[in-house]
Structure formats: structure tokens, C-alpha cells
């Protein structure tokens, strides 16, 4: 186990009341959060979203990505379902950090795509570690999920880490003229499933 569960509190939102659960990485002290809606116990697979932190999309309403749209759509679907989990994975910019993400944006403004920009900065296309999320699910007592994602690599890594993904639920929202190239690159170079 790479994490420990350290704190929890009620979090009222426009979608209803969630239980916010805080986790701390044992090796680094970095924190991550789960938002739990309704009763997630039992044997029925839970609707879940692993959402990687995106300050620009989630809090600053950037149209360069689909992250903020996905966050809102996931919370809406979880609330409509009556139970579910959103893991807020604190690995900004596919885990290159906020300042490097801004540098990557500047490279994209010069014509590089999102993958090329990461490579120009010395990073892989995706630096995230989703095994942390498998540990978060396990600490919440959940082993079977219906995962809201367009990323087959996320499904693969969580499955290898012991989470039974019963169904991949597409989450295709937020395409606009500002992020079309970004989304097309994610589909073409990173294998994201954005046409279903």
C-alpha cells in the first residue's frame, strides 16, 4: 500500500453531499482526495472516475482541454446514479507539474502538440502513476468499478493493480475549437477512445 487514509469530512456541492476522504502518499507526503457519494458498500460495482488534477481546466475554466467538463459530467453522473466515487488524483499536467504544464502550453502555442510539447521538456507523454488510485479504491473497500474514462491505459493499469473494471463508461464532453487538436492528439498518439 502506497497511501494511508488520513482524514474525512462532509463536502456539500451543487450535485449533493459527498464524503471527502483525504489520503497521503507514504513515500512523499503528497495528498490525494476521494469524493464518495452515497453508500458504496455491497457487491454492486460502483460508478467511479479517476480524475487527474487540472488547475487550468477544473478551477480556471480553460477551454484548452476537456478536464473541467469531464469533472462536472462525472460528478453529475455519480449523483444521478445515487452512489459513486471520484478520485481526485493530484498529478497536475499528466504529472509534469503546473509550471511545466505552462511551459508545455507555450510550446503548443508555437505549434507542438501535447505529446511533442512534453517530449520537448524531457517528459514522457504521460507521467502519471495510476497504481496510487488502485490503493485509494482498496482503502475505500472497493474492488469492482464501472470506470468513467476514455483512457484504455488507465483501465489496464488499474486492472493490473487488482481493481476489477466491470465496464468502461465513456466520458466524451467539452470538445470545442480551442481543444480539438489536443483531443485529436490524445486519440491518435495516446490511444484515448474519443469517438464512442
From Swiss-Prot:
GO-annotated molecular function: GTP binding; GTP cyclohydrolase II activity; zinc ion binding
Active-site residues per Swiss-Prot or TrEMBL entry: 126, 128
Cofactor: Zn(2+)
Keyword check for tRNA processing: no
Entry-linked SUPFAM superfamilies: RibA-like
Keywords of the record: GTP-binding, Hydrolase, Metal-binding, Nucleotide-binding, Riboflavin biosynthesis, Zinc
GO CC annotations on file: cytosol
EC number assigned by the record: 3.5.4.25
Annotated positions binding Zn(2+): 54, 65, 67
Keyword Cell cycle tagged: no
One record GO biological process: riboflavin biosynthetic process
InterPro entries found in the cross-reference section: GTP_cyclohydro_II (IPR032677), RibA (IPR000926), RibA-like_sf (IPR036144)
Cofactor note: Binds 1 zinc ion per subunit.
This protein's pathway: Cofactor biosynthesis; riboflavin biosynthesis; 5-amino-6-(D-ribitylamino)uracil from GTP: step 1/4
Reaction catalyzed: GTP + 4 H2O = 2,5-diamino-6-hydroxy-4-(5-phosphoribosylamino)-pyrimidine + formate + 2 phosphate + 3 H(+)
CDD domains associated with the record: GTP_cyclohydro2
Pfam families: GTP_cyclohydro2
Binding site for GTP: 49-53, 70, 92-94, 114, 149, 154
Similarity annotation: Belongs to the GTP cyclohydrolase II family.
Subunit structure: Homodimer.
Reported function: Catalyzes the conversion of GTP to 2,5-diamino-6-ribosylamino-4(3H)-pyrimidinone 5'-phosphate (DARP), formate and pyrophosphate.
Protein name: GTP cyclohydrolase-2
Species classification: Bacteria, Pseudomonadati, Pseudomonadota, Gammaproteobacteria, Enterobacterales
Amino acid at each position: 500500500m502506497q497511501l494511508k487514509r488520513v482524514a474525512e469530512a462532509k463536502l456539500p456541492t451543487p450535485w449533493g453531499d459527498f464524503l471527502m476522504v483525504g489520503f497521503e502518499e507514504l513515500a512523499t507526503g503528497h495528498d490525494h482526495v476521494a469524493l464518495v457519494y452515497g453508500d458504496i458498500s455491497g457487491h454492486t460495482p460502483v460508478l467511479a472516475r479517476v480524475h487527474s488534477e487540472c488547475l487550468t481546466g477544473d478551477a480556471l475554466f480553460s477551454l484548452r482541454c476537456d478536464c473541467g467538463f469531464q469533472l462536472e459530467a462525472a460528478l453529475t453522473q455519480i449523483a444521478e446514479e445515487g452512489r459513486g466515487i471520484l478520485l481526485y488524483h493530484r498529478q497536475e499536467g499528466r504529472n509534469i507539474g503546473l509550471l511545466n504544464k505552462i511551459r508545455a502550453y507555450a510550446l503548443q502555442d508555437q505549434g507542438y502538440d501535447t505529446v511533442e510539447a512534453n517530449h520537448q521538456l524531457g517528459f514522457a507523454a504521460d507521467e502519471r502513476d495510476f497504481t496510487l488510485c488502485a490503493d485509494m479504491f482498496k482503502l475505500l473497500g472497493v474492488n469492482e468499478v464501472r470506470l468513467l474514462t476514455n483512457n484504455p491505459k488507465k483501465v489496464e493499469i488499474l486492472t493490473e493493480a487488482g481493481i476489477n473494471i466491470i465496464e468502461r463508461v465513456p466520458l466524451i464532453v467539452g470538445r470545442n475549437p480551442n481543444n480539438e487538436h489536443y483531443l485529436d492528439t490524445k486519440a491518435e498518439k495516446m490511444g484515448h477512445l474519443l469517438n464512442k
